[in-house]
Amino acid sequence: MSVNVNRSVSDQFYRYKMPRLIAKVEGKGNGIKTVIVNMVDVAKALNRPPTYPTKYFGCELGAQTQFDVKNDRYIVNGSHEANKLQDMLDGFIKKFVLCPECENPETDLHVNPKKQTIGNSCKACGYRGMLDTHHKLCTFILKNPPENSDIGTGKKEKEKKNRKGKDKENGSVSTSETPPPPPPNEISPPHAVEEEEDDDWGEDTTEEAQRRRMDEISDHAKGLTLSDDLERTVEERVNILFDFVKKKKEEGIIDSSDKEIVAEAERLDVKAMGPLVLTEVLFDEKIREQIKKYRRHFLRFCHNNKKAQRYLLHGLECVVAMHQAQLISKIPHILKEMYDADLLEEEVIISWSEKASKKYVSKELAKEIRVKAEPFIKWLKEAEEESSGGEEEDEDENIEVVYSKTASVPKVETVKSDNKDDDIDIDAI
């Protein structure tokens, strides 16, 4: 699950996202440590080396840190909860990632070890400034500058501007002329010629460049759409699924779209609520016929999924509410059709019948629907009792009596009676 990079922004459509931190505690006793499993992904979203936030945790917690770059293992000694580290990460983002002006995380760090300064530039608003180097992490950053923040970054830009300025003043530079040597205090980039030949989309207006830009933008937009859909609320995702199913029906291809519909529901992470959408789109007053027609569609959602079956029952209530006059008396038959089609299990139906909910229809209608369903519910319970009773009888029939030769025989003692008349003479019998 992803969260906003700037968690003070509650907008769900905020474009800057990062994965939620995952922490795993390993070891025991003095060797206990917390491995931040997805630190590489988090750091990538922040445009910072993964060692920076890990070291920041160590500075804030007063704990030692370990970096295994080859195996992507970033460790903080001690046992620490993921939520605690996530809150602590907000402090790192505020100090070392967000722009002080626009509060967007589109910043780059520019480290100058000689001057012991860390510059900060924002690509969103153009802000340029210096970071406060009093934090302990700054010492680590000065010793380990980010790869994209070499000292010559600003100088490269200056050299590029100088070259462009000279081109404007002197026209195009001829190949026979030797370019002027760089100033003694600056180091010319080793691939300056290659940099000049890089594509600059801001200046290239050819049809090929425009087409290439549009292709990349469209591909990127598709990826954003897929990820953005999962960031929406459940209600919004259900509405997307509803529009998808409705479109299939309007196009006349709903009968063969059962696999596509369940795949879309899984993509939107609302598979259990699929039957609720299907009932609204596919069912009307002819529901008994439609259950048979669209059985395969519902079975893909309801098979061995009790939650989906409950949503199917709630969907049925909604259909009855829309066609109450035609369907209210047919409730037992409709439930029997769904039961026979293996869309509903006994346990789910009985549980649903025991409590009326006003979440989808009025409380009065929910109660009335359950009253009308009583004959079928009663039949279900009786059938269940009969089946359980039959099983007990079968068990009794299958019991095998085993006689033991070593079993002890109880000893019978004769009791003498005081009444002599009651004595029986065995010889006289």
From Swiss-Prot:
Domain W2: 231-390
Tree of life domain: Eukaryota
GO-annotated biological processes: regulation of translational initiation; ribosome assembly
PROSITE patterns: W2
Pfam families: eIF-5_eIF-2B, W2
UniProt KW Nucleotide-binding keyword: yes
Chain intervals for the UniProt region annotation (Disordered): 143-216
Residue numbers carrying Phosphothreonine: 225
Ranges of compositional bias, category Pro residues: 178-187
Compositionally biased spans, kind Acidic residues: 194-207
Compositional bias ranges of the Basic and acidic residues kind: 153-170
Annotated positions binding GTP: 27-34
CDD domains per the UniProt record, alphabetical: W2_eIF5
Keywords per UniProt: Cytoplasm, GTP-binding, GTPase activation, Initiation factor, Isopeptide bond, Nucleotide-binding, Phosphoprotein, Protein biosynthesis, Ubl conjugation
Gene Ontology molecular functions: GTP binding; GTPase activator activity; translation initiation factor activity
A cellular-component GO term for this protein: cytosol
Localization annotation: Cytoplasm
Cross-link type Glycyl lysine isopeptide (Lys-Gly) (interchain with G-Cter in SUMO2), residue numbers: 411, 416
Record PTM Phosphoserine, positions in chain: 10, 227, 387-388, 408, 417
Location, primary (coarse class): cytoplasm
Marked site positions, Arginine finger: 15
Function text: Component of the 43S pre-initiation complex (43S PIC), which binds to the mRNA cap-proximal region, scans mRNA 5'-untranslated region, and locates the initiation codon. In this complex, acts as a GTPase-activating protein, by promoting GTP hydrolysis by eIF2G (EIF2S3). During scanning, interacts with both EIF1 (via its C-terminal domain (CTD)) and EIF1A (via its NTD). This interaction with EIF1A contributes to the maintenance of EIF1 within the open 43S PIC. When start codon is recognized, EIF5, via its NTD, induces eIF2G (EIF2S3) to hydrolyze the GTP.
Family: Belongs to the eIF-2-beta/eIF-5 family.
Subunit structure: Component of the 43S pre-initiation complex (43S PIC), which is composed of the 40S ribosomal subunit, EIF1, eIF1A (EIF1AX), eIF3 complex, EIF5 and eIF2-GTP-initiator tRNA complex (eIF2 ternary complex). Interacts with eIF1A (EIF1AX) during scanning. Interacts through its C-terminal domain (CTD) with EIF1 or with eIF2-beta (EIF2S2) (mutually exclusive) through a common binding site. Interacts through its C-terminal domain (CTD) with the CTD of EIF5B. Interacts with FMR1 isoform 6; this interaction occurs in a RNA-dependent manner.
Name the record gives this protein: Eukaryotic translation initiation factor 5
Organism per entry: Mus musculus (Mouse)
